[in-house]
């Protein structure tokens, strides 16, 4: 595994609403750990989008090759800069469904195009299929830093307002994952008639 450079980690995993100066393009990076249920690390790597192939699809290919033994259970933790698009969400659900010996958890730094219905549906589909999607907060950023960054033995230094940004993104994800039936009931309870 080639560890991420510190500057790449801070720029790409930064959860600020706006890119700080100097401006740069935020790309998708996916860092994952493949472990046995008792915690033994089998493999870890950092992936990113490649020529019209999303990082999630590269991840599926890698995991397929590493987990051929279906008698062995595996746990996978993913740290990703952007939450999956609807297509990748669908592919991840199908992959985990076809491989019941795998357990997958996703931690996203930011929500990708979260205001669009299809992207919200993708997140709901992951959640309903038993693939938890959560927002990265300080412990996840620290773990990602320790395991995937060439940090030269320096500890993670949170950027300003990291906690506030995480809480804001978590609230948004919570609203997306709230079943619509609950919202309908809330409107009925308003008794606007």
Swiss-Prot record:
One of its GO terms (cellular component) is cytoplasm. The active site is at 56 (proton donor). One of its GO terms (molecular function) is cytidine deaminase activity. This is DNA dC->dU-editing enzyme APOBEC-3H. It comes from Felis catus (Cat). GO terms for biological process: cytidine to uridine editing; defense response to virus; DNA cytosine deamination; negative regulation of single stranded viral RNA replication via double stranded DNA intermediate. Keywords: Cytoplasm, Hydrolase, Metal-binding, Zinc. Changing residue 65 to I: In allele A3Z3; haplotype 5; confers resistance to FIV vif-mediated degradation.
